[in-house]
Amino acid sequence: MRILVCAKQVPDTNEVKIDPKTGTMIREGVPSILNPDDANALEAALVIKDENPGTEVIVMTMGPPQASEMLRECLAMGADEAYLLSDRAFGGADTWATSATLAAGIKKVKKVDLVLAGRQAIDGDTAQVGSQIAQRLKMPVVTYVEDIKIEDKKAIVHRQMEDGYEVIEVQLPCLLTCVKELNDPRYMSVGGIMDAYEQPITIWNHEDIGLSPEACGLNASPTQVFRSFSPPAKGGGEMITGTTVNEVAGSLVSKLKEKHII
C-alpha cells in the first residue's frame, strides 16, 4: 500500500502579527511549523504503516525551498519519501490553484492507494484544498475524519459531526481529511532526525508536473486576498455580584434594560 500525505509549512500563528499600515502578515522572524492537522494526517499514515508491513508513506508539499525543512521533519517521524513542489510560478496561489498543483504532483507519483490531508491549514482556515484535490483526481473523499481502519481495499472511517460521528465505508483509492481528535502525532527520534538528513527530497517545478505557468499560482487563482487585519480589541466583561441568586439576576436584568438589550 502507498499512502501520500499532503502537508504544509505554515507560520506559527502564536507569533503572527499584522502590519497595521499594509494589512499584510509580517513573516520576518516568525517561526514556521508543520501544519497541526497535517501532522495528524501523517501520524495516521504512519500508524497504518506500522500495522501493515510493506506500506510506504510519501509526503508532498507545495512551497518555497525552505519548506524542505518541514519535509525533513516528516521523514524523521517515519515517512519514506518526500516531494517538494517549488516554483515561482506557484506563488500567490489560492486554494483552487494550490489543489491543481498538488493534484498534478500526485498524478506524477506512481500509484497511490490513499491520500491523507489535514482538515485545514491554520494560516488560511479554508478547509477547501483536500476536497478540491479529490475532485481533480476523481477520488471519493471523506472530510473531518477522526478514526481510520483499512480492511480489504477499503477504508472504514468515523466522520466527525456536531453531535457525534458517522461511520462511512469507502473504497480505495480515496482521500481523507483528518482532524486533531484522530491521534497524537509522534515525536521525532534522534536516529530519525539523523537519517532524515541523509534522505533525498525530490523537487519538481511546473514543467516537471506538466503545468503551464498560466495553470498555476496567481495566474490560475480566481480569488485573491485583498486585506488581512486584526479585529479590534473588545472591552473587558463586567462581573455582577450579589448575596443571593435573585439579587444577581435582578442586577443583570436591570443592566440589560439600560443597554436596551431587553
Swiss-Prot record:
Belongs to the ETF beta-subunit/FixA family. NCBIfam families: flavo_sub_EftB. It catalyses: hydrocaffeoyl-CoA + 2 reduced [2Fe-2S]-[ferredoxin] + 2 NAD(+) = (E)-caffeoyl-CoA + 2 oxidized [2Fe-2S]-[ferredoxin] + 2 NADH. Caffeyl-CoA reductase-Etf complex catalyzes the reduction of caffeyl-CoA to yield hydrocaffeyl-CoA. It couples the endergonic ferredoxin reduction with NADH as reductant to the exergonic reduction of caffeoyl-CoA with the same reductant. It uses the mechanism of electron bifurcation to overcome the steep energy barrier in ferredoxin reduction. The electron transfer flavoprotein (Etf) mediates the electron transfer between the different donors and acceptors. The complex can also reduce 4-coumaroyl-CoA and feruloyl-CoA. Transmembrane segments: none annotated. This is Caffeyl-CoA reductase-Etf complex subunit CarD. Pfam families: ETF. Its EC number is 1.3.1.108. Its cofactor is FAD; AMP. Keywords: Cytoplasm, FAD, Flavoprotein, NAD, Oxidoreductase. It is found in: Cytoplasm. InterPro entries: ET-Flavoprotein_bsu_CS, ETF_a/b_N, ETF_b, ETF_beta_N, Rossmann-like_a/b/a_fold. Part of the homotrimeric caffeyl-CoA reductase-Etf complex composed of (R)-2-hydroxyisocaproyl-CoA dehydratase CarC, and the electron transfer flavoprotein (ETF) alpha (CarE) and beta (CarD) subunits. GO terms for cellular component: cytoplasm. The keyword Transmembrane helix does not apply. GO terms for molecular function: electron transfer activity; FAD binding; oxidoreductase activity, acting on the CH-CH group of donors, NAD or NADP as acceptor. PANTHER family: ELECTRON TRANSFER FLAVOPROTEIN BETA-SUBUNIT, PROTEIN FIXA. Binds 1 FAD per subunit. Binds 1 AMP per subunit.
